Amino acid sequence: MSDWDSVTRIGSKNRGGPVVRETVIKGKSALNAAQRQGLVVGTEKKFASGNSAGRASAVEGQHLTKVDRSDDIVKPKTVGLQVADAIKKRRTDEGYKMTQKELATKCNTTVTVIQDFERGTAAPDQKVLSAMERVLNIKLRGSDIGKEKFPKKK
């Protein structure tokens, strides 16, 4: 084919030809049909959906992706025993003495959540932790866990 036979298009409206695009398959039957045709099939789980992509749940989605892609067992994040001991100690202290139910009511959460926090097995929830800090007047996050948030003046 010589230069006389080929067409060279110049201009802003010039586009390339059609390309094979990536398609999203919804449903098991379409997936099976693609596999029968011998097409390349890759599956990915979408963790963030809708408007939640830019919010705090994106971090959780990243963690789930990490867990999904790793071969070894990834241990879930917990508040730890230091926080658990601080909550238990403060709840039984004089002046702050209260049951788990009373603490749950004041923190606007359930008794089971309080029990998980006192066991040290709960996932760190900033809303619950800040409510507990306010009610118990101790620090549960940062470096000096268990110290009084606003100590009494001498």
Swiss-Prot record:
Keyword Kinase: no
Domain HTH cro/C1-type: start-end pairs: 87-143
Ranges annotated as DNA-binding: 100-119
GO molecular function annotations of the record: DNA binding
Record keywords: Activator, DNA-binding, Transcription, Transcription regulation
InterPro entries reported for this sequence: Cro/C1-type_HTH (IPR001387), Lambda_DNA-bd_dom_sf (IPR010982), MBF1_N (IPR013729)
Entry-linked Gene3D superfamilies: lambda repressor-like DNA-binding domains
Keyword Heme on entry: no
UniProt GO cellular component terms: nucleus
Classification via SUPFAM superfamilies: lambda repressor-like DNA-binding domains (SSF47413)
Top-rank taxon: Eukaryota
Family (UniProt): Belongs to the MBF1 family.
Function: Transcriptional coactivator that stimulates GCN4-dependent transcriptional activity by bridging the DNA-binding region of GCN4 and TBP (SPT15), thereby recruiting TBP to GCN4-bound promoters. Involved in induction of the ribosome quality control (RQC) pathway; a pathway that degrades nascent peptide chains during problematic translation. Required to prevent stalled ribosomes from frameshifting.
Protein name: Multiprotein-bridging factor 1
Organism the protein comes from: Emericella nidulans (strain FGSC A4 / ATCC 38163 / CBS 112.46 / NRRL 194 / M139) (Aspergillus nidulans)
Gene designation: mbf1
